[in-house]
Amino acid sequence: MIRLAQQTQVLKGKPPNQFVPHPTKNSLTHPMKFNGTIAMEHHEHNYAIPYTPATFNNPALATYQVSPANHFVPHFGGNIGANNNNHLAQNNSNNSNNHHNNNRNHHHNNNRNHHQNNHNHSKYNNSNQGNSISPDSPWFHKVCAFEDCVSQTLYMSQTPRRQNMKHHSEHPNSNANPLFWDSIGRAMGLYHDLLTTPELNSDRVSKLVHLLHNGLRANRNQLTRMNKKPDYDSQSFHKEMTNYLCKSLREISEDVLNGKVELNEYGAMHLITAFKELLLFEEAVDIWKAAINGQNTYTSNIFLNPRVVGVILPILYDNGVSYPEIQALYEKSSSMINYFHPNLSVGMIRASLSASENDMALKLFQKLCQESTEMKYGYLIETHLSFIGECKDLNVAQTFFDKALNDEMPYKIDLQVSYVKSFLRNIWSQTRDFNHIYQIWYKSSLHYGRNVNHGISSSLNDTFFDIFFENYAVDKMQGFQTLQNIIQTYNNIKHIDEPFFNIILAKCTVWHDRSILEYIDKSYEAYHIPKTIVAYRILLKSMGSVDDASNAEILQRWMDLIRKSDEIGQRFIANADWAALRDATVTWTQNDRDSKKSNMNSTQISRTATPSPSLTPMDTPAPEHLFNNPQNPMDFYSHPALQAATASGAFDEFAAEAASSSIPVDGRMVLYLKIVKRYSPYCRDSRQLARLTTGTAVKYSVLQEVLNQFQTLIVNDIPIPELHNLKPTCV
């Protein structure tokens, strides 16, 4: 094992205030220090921001200055709001320089020894792990091929958080290297071939898990850097690859639990982390519990290793394990080694933050800082981000956020947008202070700058506008004025891109106002932003929020979408295009019908003195209500037998009876069916057409009422524009 420090005990009593300084000027100019009490004071918020909406209140914010200590020691104490501009007193400069030089030498020696230990105890050291294989082995060639495949792991091993000082690193473009994905497929095939051989040892299986995990990272990284979401209608590579990676990880997990293969602690760590990143938290917990409770003592100890427990601790807490049990597991895992493991401490910090045990989290962070060298800054960065996004104490989170933005740490923090979004949601859920939300969004947008990729800015804007429209849902006038100011402000930060307006357009439907939709529509041209097909889909879909939208308006939006679809070279009308039409017509009609029925029932109930003692035949629930009743565990829409019956026409008679209801059928329903019938030749295949008719009717009862009219509808009044790429393939 790699010996990092001479620490065998969990923190007790008051932690030390002197940390090993960083051997560069940053440790002197931007120090941090903890006080033992870690008492937090309240933060007010006041930032100078252009175009601040007139309704915002801007109370004074007590500015925060970093402690003038000459050591890299985080400080969040009682003087958190104090002004202190004397970071380095002149009369202490000589002592500071001497201390800097001494510690630089100390760091050099430690790093050299640590590097040597890392080399001697490499996690994938062939000689130590028994990876050598005789050429006489019948599996020699397949083992060599397997080693060649998993060597791609080294190419993708660095994560975005593992950065040294001010240097940035990014994943390579996975799509630009098809050999990477080819290696994954070949490696899994060779895994199957070698499954029953002794050559498939824990080291080789662990490297394969590492490769699969890095495949997830590469896939996610590529998605984040795309200018637009992939069109899943066209068999998205990213979706297929995610499914393949998940299936492969599950297969290896099952083999581990069944005793067919084994993992080392690195492989187990990557396995649990991969399921966490797939958002399969319960599955990660189940695998870990099964491993530690299984009959294989080796596997049980591997999954109790600090490197693995550090990953599972916060997941366990979020899945119902009590904090005392988390502490006990932390102690048990700590006792398995004789040094302070950063992975374990990071996991305990995150679990403590989730449990609002902030003092414990801060003390562990202090010790993590003390034990960390530049080689281990990735752990500090990850923990710093956790304090921003996961700490429920907004004052603590705000302090860590400010330090990241102000570049006050010796390590360079890549401010990952997911943590900023979590911080925004925590602020909103606790305070409902939209002014504070605005300040964090504005400062984050400035931090990301003009050249940030669309995936990051869109992700931040999506959460921000979720909160914005929730805040102004019932105050359309003030909200629209504020929205105009925000658009101007954002354009000063970076050039507005199409996703920015797409997000606003999709969310402003809460106001049900045609004029606002038209304003956003015109804004694309005003800011010289060419609209992609995504914008045309949202514009059509948004008609479902306008109660007085005419059929002519909806038809025109549909025609615009079809022209754009043809322009970009689509060969058939995509599912996303049909979904936009459905939401503008069928969904609106269903919601309108349900709202009217609800109001009618409320009126009848208010006029009834006593409830009916029993159900009469007239009171018997209709089939769709029977299966959609929340008290009934059967889901009507997902039941395969009922879906098949609907598709076969078994409910046509019922639909005909419903059509004679006294409630009139809305014209949008007829428009939907006429457009579907007129453009049905441009469907991908007959199955797509079936989903648009009988399939959609399963979910929307209003469509059942008119579906029997489909074959007799006259659709000559529905125009088809001149098309060049869309072809009638479904005749």
UniProtKB/Swiss-Prot annotation:
Residues 1-10, 598-617 have a biased composition (Polar residues). Residues 101-122 have a biased composition (Basic residues). Phosphorylated. Phosphorylation promotes binding to RNA. Residues 1-29, 77-133, 590-630 are annotated as: Disordered. It is found in: Mitochondrion inner membrane. GO terms for biological process: aerobic respiration. It is a peripheral membrane protein. One of its GO terms (molecular function) is mRNA binding. GO terms for cellular component: cytoplasm; mitochondrial inner membrane; mitochondrial membrane; mitochondrion; P-body. The keyword Mitochondrion applies. The keyword RNA-binding does not apply. Residues 83-100 have a biased composition (Low complexity). The modification Phosphoserine is found at residue 132. Keywords: Membrane, Mitochondrion, Mitochondrion inner membrane, Phosphoprotein, Transit peptide. It comes from the Eukaryota. Monomer. May be involved in the processing or stability of mitochondrial mRNAs. Belongs to the RMD9 family. Present with 2080 molecules/cell in log phase SD medium. This is RNA-binding protein RMD9-like, mitochondrial.
